[in-house]
UniProtKB/Swiss-Prot annotation:
Entry keywords, A to Z: Cobalamin biosynthesis, Glycosyltransferase, Transferase
Sample GO molecular function, one term: nicotinate-nucleotide-dimethylbenzimidazole phosphoribosyltransferase activity
Listed SUPFAM superfamilies: Nicotinate mononucleotide:5,6-dimethylbenzimidazole phosphoribosyltransferase (CobT)
Name assigned to this protein: Nicotinate-nucleotide--dimethylbenzimidazole phosphoribosyltransferase
HAMAP family per record: CobT
Pfam family, one: DBI_PRT
Uppermost EC category: transferase
EC number: 2.4.2.21
């Protein structure tokens, strides 16, 4: 194990109070299981925070942005320049994620992990650049192992800052033209699947472009097969700067026992890497939604995840993760505030 992964000392969420927590949930004034996915969600949060009183404090949305060398091959409906333009849009408050964060009470931070050209003279963008776009993965490694280590360290410092500010829930979004190619390649490498089972249309590419995207990812996997000896090596060969930093931030947030809300396909690929590095991370992950991207359901099944929402989203940015916050808060509130049968003087139906 490398020094960078040794920095993450992640404990599993405690299951010592499971019987007490489950009984508390079951004795609320409702039939057992009647609140559906909110009930195991409350159990998960109580394992992390303790069984007495649950809370969400300073929920924070982190949107990680980076460009991808493979995008020059036309694997997306948009050119790489759109990454920078969208980062500017985030900074100016005009994107879907800005709207949802304002509506739902999220603090929003945008992190430039390595877009092609930095946005200068605009407040609200955190500079954590690892380069000006990754290498084209079908021709060369995306980045060096040292770059992965640096990205993890940056992400750990970012999470520590928010933890010190009292944040106990962090949600993950991303922006990067071409990053569905990187995420699909990571999925295929780690889960040992055929590329066809992992690659999808992203934001809506044609069938011809889809075939080219699949071919390029197959070339990338063949090129780097011998070098991908572990999850960090997979990131170095196939990852994006934003995927690396999301992975590191998920590891760091789990280390600090924070709730980690995972968005769609790309964020789930980062979660897949994080869980492969340290299986205890899984205890802290809340999967917000099932996206329209081909392969996302396979990853969710691999991670034994039942997402809270299925809205047909395929935007990214953390939009699905943002929309899940009211459901997470609902799980907290019913656990804290709902009467038990004995409190209400109602005959139990357990």
């Amino acid at each position: 194990m490398s020094q960078s992964t040794l920095l993450f000392q992640i404990e599993p969420a405690s299951r010592a109070q499971d019987q007490f927590i489950q009984q508390k949930i079951d004795l609320k004034t409702k039939p057992p299981g009647a609140l559906g996915l909110l009930e195991p969600l409350a159990l998960q949060i109580a394992r992390i925070q303790g069984p007495k009183q649950l809370e969400i404090v300073n929920p924070t949305m982190l949107v990680f942005a980076g460009d991808h060398g493979i995008a020059a091959e036309g694997v997306s409906i948009a050119p790489s320049e759109v990454t920078r333009q969208m980062v500017q849009n985030f900074a100016h408050g005009g994107a879907a994620i800005n709207v949802f964060c304002r509506q739902l009470g999220f603090n929003l931070e945008v992190i430039d992990c390595g877009i092609l050209t930095p946005v200068e003279g605009v407040e609200g963008i955190i500079d954590q650049r690892l380069g000006a776009g990754t290498g084209a993965i079908h021709l060369e490694p995306a980045m060096s192992l040292a770059c992965v280590d640096k990205g993890f360290a940056m992400a750990q410092a970012l999470i520590e800052r928010h933890h010190q500010a009292g944040c106990n829930l962090v949600a993950f979004g991303e922006m990067g033209i071409g990053n569905t190619s990187s995420a699909a390649a990571i999925m295929a490498a780690i889960m040992q699947l055929d590329v066809a089972d992992c690659v999808g249309r992203g934001t809506g590419i044609s069938s011809e472009t889809l075939e080219r995207k699949q071919m390029l990812i197959e070339l990338a996997l063949l090129l780097h097969q011998s070098a991908m000896t572990g999850p960090k090596q997979v990131l170095a060969c196939l990852g994006g700067f934003e995927i690396v930093q999301m992975t590191g931030a998920m590891l760091a947030a789990a280390e600090r026992k924070m709730l980690v809300v995972v968005d769609g396909f790309i964020a789930t690929a980062a979660a897949l890497v994080a869980v492969t590095i340290n299986a205890h991370v899984r205890d802290y992950l809340i999967f917000a939604h099932r996206s329209e991207e081909q392969g996302h359901q396979r990853m969710l099944e691999h991670l034994k995840a039942k997402p809270l929402l299925s809205l047909g989203l395929r935007l990214g940015e953390g939009t699905g993760a943002a929309l899940a916050l009211p459901l997470i808060q609902a799980a907290v509130n019913f656990y804290n505030q709902m009467a038990s049968f004995s409190d209400a003087g109602i005959e139990a139906v357990v």
